[in-house]
Amino acid sequence: LFFLATEFGIYTSLDAGNNWQKLPGTPTISFRDLVIQERENDLVGASFGRGFFVLDDYSALREMTKENLSKKGKLFKPRDAKLFKPRNSLGNTGGQFYIAKNPTYGAVFTYHLNDVPSTSKSRRIRSERMLNKDMKDIPFPGYDELAAEMEEKSASIILTIKDSNGNHIRNIKKNASKGSGKIAWNLRHKSYYPVRAG
C-alpha cells in the first residue's frame, strides 16, 4: 500500500505502485507532506496554503485486493473500538472557539458492495436522463406506476452484531449503495423499550 503527495492531490496504490488512483474526498491542490500515524492507521496530508487533511483508519485499503473487490460483498476487519462515555459539554475552549466534528463513536465497519438491486424509480430516472441527453421526449409514466414506485423499498444492508458465544446483540440497517461505505455500531444492545410514552 503506497501513498503519494502530488501537486494535484493525494494518490494511493493498492498494488505496490503498478496502478494509482486519487483518494476520494481530497481536493485538487498541492500536498507537500504526508505523515502516517501508525498506531491508529491514520494518514495526515499537509497542503500548500489550505491546512491539513486526515484520513481516519485507512486499514481497509490494505484488504482491497482484486480478489476481495470482485466478490459480491466484502466486510473488512474493523479496528478495535474504544469504550468511553462521550461528553457533550464544550468544556474550556481557551482563547478560541474551535470546534471540529468528532469521529464516529463505537465500532466502525467498512464494507464493499459490487452490485445493488435497483428500484423501479431509479431505473426510470436513468432512462429519462438518457432520453433527455438525446433530446427526446420523456413520456409520463402514469399515476399507477408512480404510486407503485412510492411503495417500493430501496435495497438495504443489515449488519448483525453477535457476541463471542453467538448470542444476538443488535441489527444495524443502512441504505445500500454500490461501492465502499461505512456503518457504525454504538456498542449498545438493542432497546427493550421500542415504544416510549410521551
Locations of regions flagged by a protein language model:
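Conserved aromatic beta-strand anchor motif in extracellular beta-sandwich/beta-rich domains
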Residues: 159-163
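Glycine-centered tight-turn motifs at strand-turn-strand junctions
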Residues: 168-198
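Short, solvent-exposed loop/turn and secondary-structure capping segments
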Residues: 15-16, 54-57, 64, 121-124, ...
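Surface-exposed loop/edge segments in extracytoplasmic proteins
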Residues: 19-21, 165-172
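Short beta-strands and strand-coil junctions in structured, solvent-facing domains, enriched
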Residues: 42, 116-120, 192-194
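Beta-propeller blade termini and top-face loops
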Residues: 1-97, 104-107, 114-116
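Contiguous beta-strand segments within globular domains
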Residues: 85-156, 182-184
